Structures are given as C-alpha cells and as structure tokens.
Amino acid sequence: MKLLVVGSGGREHAIAKKLLESKDVEKVFVAPGNDGMTLDGLELVNISISEHYKLIDFAKTNDVAWTFIGPDDALAAGIVDDFNQAGLKAFGPTRAAAELEWSKDFAKEIMVKYGVPTATYGTFSDFEEAKAYIEKHGAPIVVKADGLALGKGVVVAETVEQAVEAAHEMLLDNKFGDSGARVVIEEFLEGEEFSLFAFVNGDKFYIMPTAQDHKRAYDGDKGPNTGGMGAYAPVPHLPQSVVDTAVDTIVKPVLEGVIKEGRPYLGVLYAGLILTADGPKVIEFNARFGDPETQIILPRLTSDFAQNITDILDSKEPNIMWTDKGVTLGVVVASKGYPLDYERGVELPAKTEGDVITYYAGAKFAENSRALLSNGGRVYMLVTTADTVKEAQASIYQELYQQKIEGLFYRTDIGSKAIK
C-alpha cells in the first residue's frame, strides 16, 4: 500500500521512516517534507499543508490507503474533516476534537467539567482584568496564549511584572495575532514534567512509553521556550503506578468527556503532565505527536506501525509492541539564534550510519549540489537506543563532537535529569 504523511519536520520524518519499514508499504509520500527525508527513500510532494484539496486530489490520484496528519495547525484547520468528507481515511482528530489543543480555554473547560486534575486558572480577553488577576495571585504564575503559537505561547513568569508584560504582549501588542486574543493565566505547578502519548479511537486507547522533553533553549533549562531541544523515553525514574494513575484520572475521563461532547477522538493524544505532590496533573493537551518526542518513541516500536494504524482506523484491535530495552535518547541541533532570529544556509554534516539515526527538520539541498543546508530553526536530531541514559548520551554527544558543527547549537545536558 501507499501512504501519505502531511508535514515537514523531524516528527514527520520519524513517522514516515517508520511507516516505510512496514512489510506491506511500498511507498511513503511526505507533503511537503524536507530534502533530508529523501536520504531515507521517502518521496516528497510539493503541496503545502494548508492546500487540503490538492492533498486530497493527490491521495486519490496516487491510490493512497490513508494519510497521517503531523502538524497541529493542519488539524486545527479541519484537514481531517475535509479528507473524511472526500471519502478518504486520515489518522488525526477532527477540528472539533482537536480543540483540546487549539484552545487552551476549551481544554480547561473540559478538564473542569470532567474532573481532570489541572492547575487553577482564569481566562481573559481584557488586559486590565488579566492584570488584576495576576496581581491578586502573585508569582510565579503562568501566562498562555489561548491558541496555537508554535510551542512558544507560554510564559512561566517569575515575577508579577514579567507576567503582566507577557499578558500585555499577547492581548495588546498582538504578539501571537488571533492566537493571543485571549489568555489563560494559571497557577505555577511544582514537580517533574513528563509526556504521555496514546493512539486513540473513541474510547479505545493504547498508551505509548513515557517521555521527557526539554523545552528551554539552553543547558540547565535556561533561555526561552522552544518547540523542544531533545527528549528521551521511557522516563526510567517514573514509577508505573504514576502512569496508571494518569491513565485513570486523565486519559480515560478526557476521552469519555469529548465523546459526551459529541467530539469523539481519533489520532494521537498527547498529555503534557506534571507529577506534583498531589499526583499527576495536566499542563496541556496536544492533538498530535510531539516533536521531538516522536523521534525517540517510534524507534521503540517493534510491531508493524502501518498495520497498527490501519487496524486502529478500521476499529480493529491493533497488536502494538514496544521494546523494553534500555532507553532511547535524542538531541536536537538548531540554528544559532533559535527560537528568535536565526541564519539559514549552514552546510550540514553527513547523515549518520549505524546505531545513531538522523531525523531532518529544517534541511534543504543546495541549489547546484547534493549538499544539505540548514533551512529552519530546528535543523536535525540525532537519536540512539542504549542500555542506560548515560550510555545513550555518550554515544550521541561523541557523534556531535565529531561533527564539529559551526553556525548551529545544541544542548549538552539532554537526559541528565534521569541520571541520579
């Protein structure tokens, strides 16, 4: 069968590469993809993620069995609804179900209504009201744009002034456009963060290994928030009992809740969680795979990925299997200046061979050669599996040291929280 993956980043590279490993898959198209993906035998399709009807025509013309939707903005724009209306299968939630991600206020309302543990909060479109709420509750406090903001719409404010400034930028300075026309302001939760993903169809769901992402740009969790600078899975120091509690108190009630609201969920659900003194609580939901977590979760899948998704789409029981070997860890290499202004056009090192996988995100061929150049904020990610976090770290950082990259940067402490 032939499959289509929509998106262009490292997440989509990992999804498409894993699908191509399946025995029944002859071809995986990626729209629009990036040039680095072609090194793994993936076929790029020059159609933007916003051109739903061109993508639908392509899928029909090329006899695509089903389409896997990667990015949040495509889901929020109703790409799955459009595919379904055209009689095509797509793996991802409808626009209504994806509102769990594209409106933080909606997600909060669902959590409160169905008793899911999360931070106390207020939602505001008026700056003076937001300011009064911040001044009443004090800092630290968290200010979030209600809508999608490329993972950069969250400010963890250490002071009241910082929080007021963040609210001002979103509500009055239009920093995130319509996405910041409302803000959710919530209590700062103390604890360790982790990610929990599940494949979902309605009330049936299949939990993946836990993961831990590193959002801040620089070592020691310093600097601005990014889309994510590295991750590892599973989280070795997180007891299974915590995962079981999260499933019972968070995943189940939310999925049952959206069914009751007439928005049944199909696709990947991501729960960004924090383990507090009162147990796991929700920081946010995403309506799709995380980036960079996908790149360290999918290499742990030992079953046939394409068959697993086909079964879930067909409401059959999938046979999903994961390795229990050690840990999978990955480090993102980004353009200097990311997540703010950054340069493009830096020549990239050769693709890794053997146990270290390269997933490309912002990469394109030079105009007159096959040299890969940087073409985005996050450029590529190196991933490996080893018996321990320490061994995986050593393997990745040795490879990065040998690559001697200039004009790019990476964090040198990915996974260190897991080394006691």
Curated annotation (Swiss-Prot):
PROSITE patterns assigned to the protein according to its UniProt record, in alphabetical order: ATP_GRASP (PS50975), GARS (PS00184)
Catalysed reactions, semicolon-separated: 5-phospho-beta-D-ribosylamine + glycine + ATP = N(1)-(5-phospho-beta-D-ribosyl)glycinamide + ADP + phosphate + H(+)
Protein name per Swiss-Prot or TrEMBL: Phosphoribosylamine--glycine ligase
Organism listed in the record: Streptococcus pneumoniae serotype 4 (strain ATCC BAA-334 / TIGR4)
Gene Ontology terms, MF aspect: ATP binding; metal ion binding; phosphoribosylamine-glycine ligase activity
Residues where ATP binds: 134-195
Keywords in alphabetical order: ATP-binding, Ligase, Magnesium, Manganese, Metal-binding, Nucleotide-binding, Purine biosynthesis
Pfam families: GARS_A (PF01071), GARS_C (PF02843), GARS_N (PF02844)
Pathway: Purine metabolism; IMP biosynthesis via de novo pathway; N(1)-(5-phospho-D-ribosyl)glycinamide from 5-phospho-alpha-D-ribose 1-diphosphate: step 2/2
Taxonomic placement: Bacteria, Bacillati, Bacillota, Bacilli, Lactobacillales
